[in-house]
Amino acid sequence: MPRRRVAAKREILDDPKYGSQILAKFMNHVMESGKKAVAERIVYGALDTVKSRKNSDPLEIFEKALDAIAPLVEVKSRRVGGATYQVPVEVRPSRRNALAMRWLVDSARKRGEKSMALRLAGELLDASEGKGAAVKKREDVHRMAEANKAFSHYRF
């Protein structure tokens, strides 16, 4: 156990355009080298593209995409005797969102469209429909947890 006090969670301000705290957190995941204005331009550009393609609320599509990506279980390595087992554990809600955002940004960066805003929009639309690289990542993690269900009695 750590000897110091646990750091307090910082309060994140809502984003100015949509008034959503989860979108503000997502912008922080998109941001590189502290360039928040660039990250905002990318995210708002992606949401505008989503709005023009789907003619519906882009924030709803964003939240639907995050739900489709967020994992329910993951595996953690646990050493027992001389062997290391991959033990399936449930994911806490805050980590679920963080992983979903990270996977969404990573898979958007690997796409082939011209700008990051278009890549992100494409990945958001794919994820909201239950397909795309980020959803595949979630399914891989779930499959790994299912395969190692036999070791679930090694709790943390």
From Swiss-Prot:
Region forming the signal peptide: none
Keyword Ribosomal protein: yes
Entry keyword tRNA-binding: yes
Gene Ontology MF annotations: rRNA binding; structural constituent of ribosome; tRNA binding
Keywords: Ribonucleoprotein, Ribosomal protein, RNA-binding, rRNA-binding, tRNA-binding
Pfam families reported in the protein's UniProt record: Ribosomal_S7 (PF00177)
SUPFAM superfamilies membership: Ribosomal protein S7
GO terms of biological process kind: translation
GO cellular component: small ribosomal subunit
PROSITE patterns for the chain: RIBOSOMAL_S7
Role: One of the primary rRNA binding proteins, it binds directly to 16S rRNA where it nucleates assembly of the head domain of the 30S subunit. Is located at the subunit interface close to the decoding center, probably blocks exit of the E-site tRNA.
Family from the record: Belongs to the universal ribosomal protein uS7 family.
Subunit structure: Part of the 30S ribosomal subunit. Contacts proteins S9 and S11.
Protein name from the UniProt record: Small ribosomal subunit protein uS7
Organism: Azotobacter vinelandii (strain DJ / ATCC BAA-1303)
UniProt lineage: Bacteria, Pseudomonadati, Pseudomonadota, Gammaproteobacteria, Pseudomonadales
